[in-house]
Amino acid sequence: MAGGSSMEANEPRQLFIAGRKSALIRLTCAAGMRPALLEVLNTYADSLGDEPGTEMFMVHLDPDDENNVWLYETFLDDSAALAHRSTEGFAKMMNDMPPLLEGPPAILRMEPLRMSVQESVLTEDWSL
């Protein structure tokens, strides 16, 4: 089941992921522009095969504010984060977003340390 979840919990997989880089980004779109912003983000996400060091790119909708869209990104290291910002797809996304936003993105840079994930997340069929 695509994107579905099972309530059966197993022993989670514990991963030490020090050395990676991540970012939590808040995008506040102009009123009524969320569908257009999501289209830009989805188009960009479709190009992530060109970024082998981008390990995770997640788009989140804010349940409390329909004008906020959150991104969570994880990169193998600093070089991968730099390469991410140097791609053609990233440049296009950054060119397409400003007219859709109320202001500049709010970026919180982080250094992940540990991840706990249920094995079922890794084996489910999440294809679109």
Please name every model-derived segment.
Residues T28-L38:
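Short, surface-exposed ligand-recognition loops at beta-strand->loop->(often short) alpha-helix junctions
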Residues R20-T28, M58-R85, S127:
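Short, well-ordered beta-strand segments in beta-rich or mixed alpha/beta enzyme
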Residues M33-P35, S79, M115:
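Residue-level signal for secondary-structure boundary sites
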Residues A2-K21, V59-N67, N95-L128:
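Glycine-rich beta-strand-turn "strand-cap" elements at beta-sheet edges
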Residues S22, R34, F90-M93:
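A general structural signal for well-ordered alpha-helical segments in protein cores
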Residues A2-S6, F16, T43-E55, T74-R109:
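An amphipathic, aromatic/His-enriched active-site/gating alpha helix that lines ligand/cofactor pockets
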